[in-house]
Swiss-Prot record:
Designated name of the protein: Fork head domain-containing protein crocodile
Gly residues bias spans: 390-404
Result of changing residue 453 to V: In allele CROC-75-3
GO cellular component terms given for this protein: nucleus
Gene Ontology MF annotations: DNA binding; DNA-binding transcription factor activity, RNA polymerase II-specific; RNA polymerase II cis-regulatory region sequence-specific DNA binding
Amino acid sequence: MHTLFSDQNSFTRHYAQTAAGYGSASAVAAASSASAAAAAHYAYDQYSRYPYSASAYGLGAPHQNKEIVKPPYSYIALIAMAIQNAADKKVTLNGIYQYIMERFPYYRDNKQGWQNSIRHNLSLNECFVKVARDDKKPGKGSYWTLDPDSYNMFDNGSFLRRRRRFKKKDVMREKEEAIKRQAMMNEKLAEMKPLKLMTNGILEAKHMAAHAAHFKKEPLMDLGCLSGKEVSHAAMLNSCHDSLAQMNHLAGGGVEHPGFTVDSLMNVYNPRIHHSAYPYHLNEDNLATVASSQMHHVHHAAAAHHAQQLQRHVAHVAHPLTPGGQGAGGQSSGHSPTTISTPHGPAHGGWYTPETPPSEPVPHNGQQGTPTHPGHNNNNSSSVLNHNGVGNGGGGGGGGGGGSSSVLTSSPTSALGFRDMIFEQNQSCQLDTGSPTGSLQSASPPASASVAAASAAAAAAVISSHHHHHHHHAALSGNLGQLGQLSNLSHYRPHVGHYQEYGIKYGV
């Protein structure tokens, strides 16, 4: 094999054999020099990155007579090494010297030069902190330690590279900046909390707007046809009506809609149909009539008991302006208050078209008020309308006794709210079929003759059994106004048609 690719040992042995041919002295000298070169260590083995020694490959022979190379570490790195390798992370100046000489043989010579540099770096660099000696251990000199903020001054923990010169003021400035950034973040978080509350408030407002159908309001009345005293009374009554409607919806919402039906879905959540339970016009006469009816309801609790035995319902007050139904032949003459007997069905029952008001004004000339289309009745029962106290029972019902005051009885469900007690109108109103555009039609079934007869009989029984209490109602009627004087309602028909046309046109 060629000597270039041969083993280093075989080449040495070959060199020794050839050299032995010239003389024994020269051969011994060559062998000793080769063994010395193989045994010599590479001067940079202690700083090498590789675990193996460079002398194994014969690299130590050319450098065997040169001095040891200086370590590639700065004096700051050497001092930091000594401090971090100490037991308590603090060491004296003499301890630093000992660590450096034990670790790096280069510093074993020329001690005066590098030890002076160590003291100089300890004094000038702020990363080294001098700690007074407080223990009773033997020795002299203070301890040296590293500043807590300077532990990361070396890049990735390597002592060969330092990021920058450590300065305490820079560290303090960085800390202040970090505190300021944290304070700014806290302020931003504090500003975001009111925004969150506002967002929740907007969501709640949207939720209330989505459920605004529960709180129905009356359509705005065009008060141009009213003047003076009537305008103020109408505005006040409409505002009171809105408040009562909202309170009763919250208090008795479950009672008004007892079960799930298609009619309940269409009636309750349709604004135009939902108004069937409220009167469209509220004035002094209507308020007086309602108050009179309430007083009659309180004074005649016994009459309510008799009516309950007949109809299995609780006595209730109906609106006194409802015209007679188709199933009963009503008569009206004289100037006495109205007598109505109406057995109500469930609350919010029946259909209603916006063209027809819940009630018709009673003519003052003593003639019977006849609806426009008597062939269509939105009532489930019939009513008897009299001015002189003489009742004619429809379909076999008996007549009632005479009197000068009104007797108003009806029999709805016992758990109705206060709003329905005052404003329930849709059970006894006549409806006009059709609309200006033909979009709405009345779809209620006609009244039953047997129900009309039963209601008339109940009214006659109550009137005949409680005629001795009529003087209370005469006084009340005198104080609140005559119910027969209803001529101020003549404006109602064209006025209702006017704003209902706009309601249908714009979907109000």
